[in-house]
Swiss-Prot record:
GO cellular component: ribonucleoprotein complex; ribosome
Task performed by this protein: Located on the platform of the 30S subunit, it bridges several disparate RNA helices of the 16S rRNA. Forms part of the Shine-Dalgarno cleft in the 70S ribosome.
UniProt xrefs under NCBIfam families: PRK05309.1, uS11_bact
One GO MF term: structural constituent of ribosome
Family stated for the protein in its record: Belongs to the universal ribosomal protein uS11 family.
Keyword Ribonucleoprotein found: yes
HAMAP family named among the record's database cross-references: Ribosomal_uS11
Keyword vocabulary terms for this entry: Ribonucleoprotein, Ribosomal protein, RNA-binding, rRNA-binding
Protein known as: Small ribosomal subunit protein uS11
Subunit structure: Part of the 30S ribosomal subunit. Interacts with proteins S7 and S18. Binds to IF-3.
One Pfam family of this chain: Ribosomal_S11
Length: 128
């Protein structure tokens, strides 16, 4: 008889404020919520919420991912977040609005999109 795997329930930490990182790429949107020191409290992405393929890059998918991450973070007692947005994707604004709509108070908003000072050669232009 095989041993039964016991799923250990995550302990509820009391974290009143944290940092929300929204990474919006052209293909997906990933929302990670951490405590002020950087330890991950909750995370979600458009793929985790149930979207596949090109539907992951939609604003609606980003909205659901942000709501999912916010709900998980609020279970740990989080109320206030600083938001760092990275990337050029279509889910930037909708993910931010979803965090506010889920009940998190946005204290600060900062764009941390990396801009090269003429670093690596970019990928070739798409011709459609």
């Amino acid at each position: 008889m095989a041993k039964r795997k016991v799923a250990r329930k995550r302990d509820k930490k009391n974290i009143p404020s944290g940092v929300a990182h929204i990474q919006a790429t052209f293909n997906n949107t990933i929302v990670t919520i951490t405590d002020p020191s950087g330890a991950v409290v909750s995370w979600s992405s458009a793929g985790v919420v149930g979207f596949k393929g090109s539907r992951k890059s939609t604003p609606f998918a980003a909205q659901l991912a942000a709501e999912d991450a916010a709900k998980k973070a609020m279970e740990h007692g989080m109320r206030n977040v600083e938001v760092y947005v990275k990337g050029p994707g279509s889910g930037r604004e909708s993910a931010l609005r979803a965090l506010q709509g889920a009940g998190l108070n946005v204290v600060m908003l900062r764009d941390v999109t990396p801009v090269p000072h003429n670093g690596c050669r970019p990928r070739k232009r798409r011709r459609v």
